[in-house]
C-alpha cells in the first residue's frame, strides 16, 4: 500500500541524491528497518479529523494488522536501531539495515530484476541500446 510505496520512494530518492552529491563529498544513507518497537499503531491519533475514515480503521483491525502489530511489538528496540545507524554511518554504509535476515527476500528481488535485464538484452527491439555506456555509472 501507500506505506510501502513511500518507503520505496525514500530509497529511490536516497540513491538519486547519492549519485548527485558524491562529487561534492556528501554521503547519503537510508535507514531500511523492518519491525521496530514503535507506536506506529497509535499514529491514527495524529491524523486530522477531516482525514479520518472508518474504512481505514476497520482495515487496521483485520488479521493482517494484528499480525503486523504483534511483529512490531516483538521487534527490536528503538535504541538498538539508533546504535545501528551510528555504526553504519561510521562505516560509510549507504543502506542501513536492521534485519539482516531479510537478505534472501532482497536477493530474490535482485535476481528477478537481473533476469528481466538479461531478457531485455536479448530483445531485438533493444539491440541499439544494449552496448551504450551509461554516464551515470
Give residue ranges: language-model regions.
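Terminal hydrophobic/aromatic helix or amphipathic segment near a protein terminus
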Residues: 95-111, 115
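Non-catalytic terminal and boundary segments that flank Rossmann-like NAD(P)-dependent oxidoreductase
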Residues: 115-137
